[in-house]
Amino acid sequence: MSDQFTSIQWDRTEPEGDVPGDSNDHSQVQINSSINLIEEDQGQEQEQDDLVTTNTVVRGGNDSDSNPNEQIPPRDVYIRSKVSQPLKESDGQNFYISYLIETETNEPGLAKTKLKVRRRFSDSNFLYNCLANDFPTSIIPPLPNKQRLEYIKGDRFGEYFTTKRSIALNNFLNRISKHPLLKQAKIYHIFLEDSVNWNTFKQNLKISSNPNSTVGGGSTTSANANGELDSFSDYIMNAFKKPTYESENAKEFQEITDKSNKLQENINKIDKIYQRVVKRQSEISEDFRLFGDEFKKLNQILTEGSDTQFDKELSQQFTSFSENIYQISYDSFKLTRQVDLHYLTSLKDLDHYISQIKNMIKFKDSKLLDYEMLQNYLNKAIAEKNHLMNGNNVSGSDGAMNFISKKIGSLRGKTPGQTYSSGNETNDRINKLNEKIEFLEREVKETFELFHTFEKNLITEYQLFDRIKNDEITTNLHELSQYYLDYYNSVVNHWNDVEIPHSEHLTDELHVLQQSQLRKNLENISIDPKLDVNSKLFEHDDVRLNNDHIRSDLRSIKSQERKNEQVHKQDQEQGEEQEHEQDQVQNQEQEQEPEELSREEAEVLETPVQAQEQEQQEPEELHASQTESHTQSEPQNDNQHNFDDDGSDEGLVDVEGLEQW
């Protein structure tokens, strides 16, 4: 920045030999208001009425396509381009890829209605830079990213990479053709036409690295370096600042930013999901191909050495089945490639297109910061002028210089009353400050008007972007659905051609075989088991090795089952033992409780029981002693016994009484 302020200019200097102009003056910023932004029949469509606003186009100098009275063409004017057929060519030293661009149009500015031309990627990049310089306030569709891994690993000439790039370039040209201002650019028409003007225009016109300014043919490397340094310094200064001025459209821009972030987030999610879908579909396609190969081998094995009509028909059915399997594999591969090349590439391009909007909003904020910075410089200049006029000090250095100048003036014989004489340094500085203030006021006014106009134009550009984005998303989804419809229709059509014999048809054939006695001949024919011996399809003992592997696998499976059964039995036995031990412990606890109770009761009842037993034992002993004495005295005392029987039974009564007692 020079002289403590910056100048906001979007200029474009024409190259030497094109259009004469004043090389000493900077080309001024021209804001061309196009009142009729949308086409003549736009009033019939309600959704397009919002776009009928003042659209400002910042163009450069005296360029031929910067006519202020230039009108937007009607809606029936169209330009349809298609990029295809990438071709590897050489310019004698290096190889490059050129793309065929086929255009159909009714644009009056073009010489033909159908155009064909081949352009390189660098030509498209040059077109993008020219449009960015001619229309700095418009949202220019982005080009595909050139910083790709293919440039490092050397696969930039491969079919996959070039096809994807041609689709991305096709999206780039279609977006330009849908923009009402960009499709009117002269450089765009020259790009589409097959003429020598393109190479001449490209050689004479030189575009600087700054996308907001064009440097003419007389520019030097030092000028470009200074411009890049200024841009880098401005970027560093504005990176950590935010504008304090809040415009009337601040809420609308905040809503635009939120919508853009949300849309970009959803697009990234869809892209990740379809990346996985494409990967799974490619694996399915490969599996179908391998399945078709194995089915074809099986058909050859079953039909080898068989010449009957039934075998021939069966072989035809097997062949038709395997061919349909191959067709499914091819259709799956085709579907995967279409989704990958067209749909995913369109999602990536739309993501980059949204990033362009966010960059334009950041560019608007940077211009607002420049306006605030110029306003601060103007306020400082006015404050410095007021201090000088009032005789006050602004800063230490300025006060010291003022004091020294006054002392020198006093030594020369100048009195303090002669402060504003013609030779006074303070007077000269005030005059310089007045010039600086006038220049800053003019710059501040122009910068604010430019910012205000840029803000309105950016709102209109977002509406145009929203319309282009909706059309593009609708077209992409329609194409995606068409890809899947074509895939399933192809599968159904191919499988309908396969004739599967019904049970009645098979019964009739068997009946014919029985009637012609072919069945007996077939029973006598010994057919070798094709899957047990080696043949052309199975060499190097593949069948035997396969059977060995199967037997070993069966053995391992059976051994594993036995081990599992043993482990299960051991677990059951351990569980039963644990339950038995628990039952024993519970029974022992229950037995110990009544034993303790019986011991206590026995101690309590021991005394009365012993007494009762003694009482019962005494009469028994007495009775036993009497019976013994009676038996001993019976032969000696017979008379006495008779006497007792006849006379009295006193002795017996006494015994009974004792017993009763």
From Swiss-Prot:
For the keyword rRNA processing, the answer is no
| Amino acid composition bias (Acidic residues), ranges on this chain | 38-49, 645-661
Renumbered residue ranges of the record's region Disordered: 1-49, 56-75, 554-661
InterPro entries per the UniProt record, alphabetical: AH/BAR_dom_sf (IPR027267), PX_dom (IPR001683), PX_dom_sf (IPR036871)
Superkingdom of source: Eukaryota
Single GO cellular component term = phagophore assembly site
SMART domains per UniProt: PX
Which terms are listed as keywords in the entry? Autophagy, Cytoplasm, Lipid-binding, Membrane, Protein transport, Transport, Vacuole
Which amino acid positions bind a 1,2-diacyl-sn-glycero-3-phospho-(1D-myo-inositol-3-phosphate), per UniProt? 120, 122, 146, 165
Domain comment quoted from the record: The PX domain binds phosphatidylinositol 3-phosphate which is necessary for peripheral membrane localization to the perivacuolar punctate structures.
Q: What is the official name of this protein in its record?
A: Sorting nexin-4
